[in-house]
């Protein structure tokens, strides 16, 4: 598929690719290895965006001709495919086919996103209290948090639908314009931000459930040294490309997200030293207080350092000096060639269909 990115999405793709490039650069003290890592990440992301576009467009409404070339989102696709297949092999697990619409039908009002948001918000507020007495003393605040969570669950899907309605004419016009130049290409994809689809009810429910679970796991997991705080805001971006694989199944999405975050916490812990080194160098060069990490602490980022792309590309580039880069080059070229062959076959098939 011919792949184009809007300006915001291109910036997000470059930013995340630059993140891994910067970590490799500061770790190896070699800017060429940094460029290499960033370029490899960029290539793999664009190819995967093309390959996942059909499933993405089929699952989400009004997303025809749209793809998501965002490294963090795409990095969980292989992970989700493997775990989803393993879950399908568990006897009786297929009966737990619960999606947002199924929850509404089965539980009525209690399955509505608004109600779920209130319950989850009140639950999180209650868990933040040290005793039952503190819970009783803070009932107004707990209920307030529940109402805010309910509002988030209800309003975000509506807001994102407005964005989709506004971007749809732009997307269609761009596709028509490019189609005139590439007349034989019928698989044009416009790269957009995953923010367009984070308002899906399953994404909201699973993300909100995983926030307290992730904090709890960060405290009890042996060997983990990372406590996510600001990074929790990026939790929603874990699921845009997982949902097309699980068909929006809440249980499957939660399990995949849980496993991904457990592994991701260890990924972030392993890269924290290099992340901190990069942040200190930036602070010394710019004096920017936002990147100043206090002495005795290390920094990390759950919303990209926890991904398979970041961890894999870093270690194959930095830890395995010769073999690793060769593997990455072979992987990127192999994926690009396979994608090109797939595109050519699809175009030929579509061309023959139109002739008939």
Language-model regions, residue ranges each:
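Hydrophobic core segments of alpha-helical transmembrane domains in multi-pass membrane transport
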Residues: 17-25, 38-50, 116-129, 146-157, ...
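Juxtamembrane inter-helical linkers in multi-pass membrane proteins
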Residues: 56-100, 165-193, 282-288, 352-356
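Alpha-helical transmembrane segments and their helix-start/interface "positive-inside/aromatic belt" motifs
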Residues: 30-39, 111-114, 141-149, 248-260
């Amino acid at each position: 598929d011919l792949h184009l990115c809007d300006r915001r999405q291109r910036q997000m793709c470059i930013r995340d690719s630059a993140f891994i490039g910067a970590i490799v650069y500061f770790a190896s003290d070699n800017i060429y290895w940094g460029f290499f890592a960033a370029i490899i990440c960029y290539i793999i992301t664009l190819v995967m965006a093309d390959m996942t576009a059909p499933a993405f467009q089929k699952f989400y409404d009004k997303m025809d001709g749209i793809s998501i070339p965002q490294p963090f989102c795409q990095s969980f696709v292989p992970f989700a495919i493997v775990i989803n297949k393993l879950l399908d092999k568990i006897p009786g697990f297929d009966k737990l086919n619960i999606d947002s619409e199924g929850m509404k039908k089965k539980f009525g009002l209690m399955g509505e996103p608004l109600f779920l948001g209130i319950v989850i918000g009140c639950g999180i507020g209650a868990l933040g209290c040290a005793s039952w007495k503190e819970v009783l003393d803070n009932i107004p605040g707990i209920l307030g948090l529940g109402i805010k969570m309910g509002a988030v669950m209800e309003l975000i899907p509506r807001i994102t639908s407005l964005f989709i309605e506004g971007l749809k004419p732009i997307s269609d016009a761009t596709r028509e314009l490019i189609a005139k130049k590439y007349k034989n290409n019928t698989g044009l994809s416009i790269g957009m931000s995953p923010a367009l689809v984070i308002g899906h009810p399953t994404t909201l429910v699973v993300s909100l459930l995983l926030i307290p679970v992730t904090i709890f796991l960060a405290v009890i997991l042996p060997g983990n040294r990372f406590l996510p705080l600001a990074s929790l805001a990026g939790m929603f971006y874990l699921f845009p490309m997982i949902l097309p694989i699980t068909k929006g199944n809440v249980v499957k999405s939660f399990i995949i997200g849980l496993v991904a975050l457990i592994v991701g916490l260890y990924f972030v812990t392993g890269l924290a030293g290099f992340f901190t080194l990069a942040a200190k160098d930036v602070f010394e060069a710019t004096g920017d207080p936002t990147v100043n990490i206090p002495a005795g602490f290390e920094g990390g980022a759950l919303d990209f350092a926890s991904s398979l792309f970041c961890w894999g590309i870093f270690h194959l580039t930095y830890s395995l000096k010769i073999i690793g880069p060769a593997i990455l080059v072979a992987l990127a070229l192999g994926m690009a060639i396979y994608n090109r062959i797939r595109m050519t076959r699809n175009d030929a098939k579509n061309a023959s269909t139109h002739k008939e």
